[in-house]
Amino acid sequence: MNRFIIADASKCIGCRTCEVACVVSHQENQDCASLTPETFLPRIHVIKGVNISTATVCRQCEDAPCANVCPNGAISRDKGFVHVMQERCIGCKTCVVACPYGAMEVVVRPVIRNSGAGLNVRADKAEANKCDLCNHREDGPACMAACPTHALICVDRNKLEQLSAEKRRRTALMF
């Protein structure tokens, strides 16, 4: 079973610290000072309602719809998470439509391309953007480490069984 992150809405205060930690974690220089509206592209999103806030993030589906519909095979399961190979992504947005959680998005990043005439030109490349569980970090997902209320938890098979057992116990004790 793939691990995934879920948010406890009863603990989330909507501060968006998880979003900032995510973006900084995925930057080369990992510096908050270099963030701009163009580079602020989190892979986790805080949704605020009238009385509740919570974060939405990729569920790392076992039979990932995003991977199943990708025409270039740019999305695959790798080391326990669903991974996007950006060099294969064509930005077609099929994965965005297929994701039942709204956790996949296509973002535009500036790239330098060779024009064929020996000139390098600046262009934009659309690519899929989703949670990768911060696989580049030894300490695990940056969003979880940064959350001041510990509203984010990483769920694996054991944690899922524990959560289910707690819910069954609460349900049984209600009657």
UniProtKB/Swiss-Prot annotation:
Residues at which [4Fe-4S] cluster 1 binds: C12, C15, C18, C147
Binding residues annotated for [4Fe-4S] cluster 2, in chain numbering: C22, C131, C134, C143
One MF annotation (Gene Ontology) recorded for this entry: metal ion binding
Keyword Zinc attached: no
Lineage: Bacteria, Pseudomonadati, Pseudomonadota, Gammaproteobacteria, Enterobacterales
Disulfide-bond pairs as recorded: none
Gene3D superfamilies documented for this protein: 3.30.70.20
Key words of the record: 4Fe-4S, Electron transport, Iron, Iron-sulfur, Metal-binding, Repeat, Transport
Binding site for [4Fe-4S] cluster 4: C70, C89, C92, C95
Cross-referenced PROSITE patterns: 4FE4S_FER_1, 4FE4S_FER_2
Pfam families linked: Fer4_11, Fer4_4
CDD domains: HycB_like (cd10554)
Cofactor requirements of the protein: [4Fe-4S] cluster
Protein name, entry field: Electron transport protein HydN
Binding positions for [4Fe-4S] cluster 3 per the UniProt entry: C58, C61, C66, C99
Domain 4Fe-4S ferredoxin-type, first and last residues per copy: 2-32, 48-79, 80-109, 124-157
Primary role: Electron transport from formate to hydrogen.
Cofactor note as given: Binds 4 [4Fe-4S] clusters.
NCBIfam families reported in the protein's UniProt record: PRK10330.1
Species annotation: Escherichia coli (strain K12)
